[in-house]
């Protein structure tokens, strides 16, 4: 999880690599800044500006690393359909090794069927504990695998299903958290808009 090392921890790792031979660092750029702690500063922030994927790769190469972008690019969790959808919508390159099958399903026309199924894990942006259904926050789901997931979107992502959706206009940390949420399921991935869920939300709030 090389992407989780920030600031002094990152500098320590980089210093150690200059002293050791045959160092292999494994990580996913698109999962940085997802955790609630240790998610700011170097190497993914340059002052107040986000460091892009290309700039981060260039920095590693300038530091003497050979950067392998393909060996671990295939998901052992997500289906080809889900990986293709993520690549298309989020502009994040990900492919599937074909171990699992699953579809991307928008459920705005009939959301209660999925929301009422306990076997389907609901992934919300925050405050997961406030709901009666089994839910996890997007960021806390990192590293987990579920049989099927329902991602409840935020207001700013309500147009994810539109051809006009532009991931470049989404805050990088939010995009990374969405990427994490959308890659948790080994089966189907259900998506519901914030505008749809708001109409039903009160029925699922724990009292």
Give the label of every model feature segment.
Residues 1-116, 121, 125-180, 184-207:
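Conserved helicase motor core of SF1/SF2 NTP-dependent helicases
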């Amino acid at each position: 999880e090389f992407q989780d090392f920030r600031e002094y921890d990152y500098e320590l790792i980089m210093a150690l690599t200059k002293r050791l031979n045959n160092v292999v660092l494994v990580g996913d750029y698109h999962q940085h800044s997802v955790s609630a702690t240790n998610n700011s500063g170097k190497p993914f922030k340059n002052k107040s500006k986000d460091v892009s994927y290309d700039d981060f790769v260039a920095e590693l190469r300038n530091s003497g690393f050979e950067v392998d972008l393909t060996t671990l690019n295939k998901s052992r969790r997500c289906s080809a359909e889900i990986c293709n959808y993520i690549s298309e919508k989020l502009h994040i390159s990900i492919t599937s090794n074909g171990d699992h099958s699953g579809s991307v399903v928008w459920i705005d026309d009939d959301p209660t069927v999925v929301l009422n199924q306990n076997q389907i894990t609901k992934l919300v942006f925050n405050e997961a504990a406030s709901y009666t259904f089994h839910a996890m926050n997007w960021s806390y789901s990192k590293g987990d695998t579920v049989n099927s997931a329902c991602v409840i979107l935020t207001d700013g992502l309500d147009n994810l299903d539109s051809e006009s959706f532009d991931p470049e206009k989404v805050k990088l940390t939010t995009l990374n958290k969405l990427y994490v949420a959308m890659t948790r399921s080994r089966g189907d991935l259900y998506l519901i808009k914030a505008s749809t869920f708001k109409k039903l939300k009160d029925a699922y709030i724990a009292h």
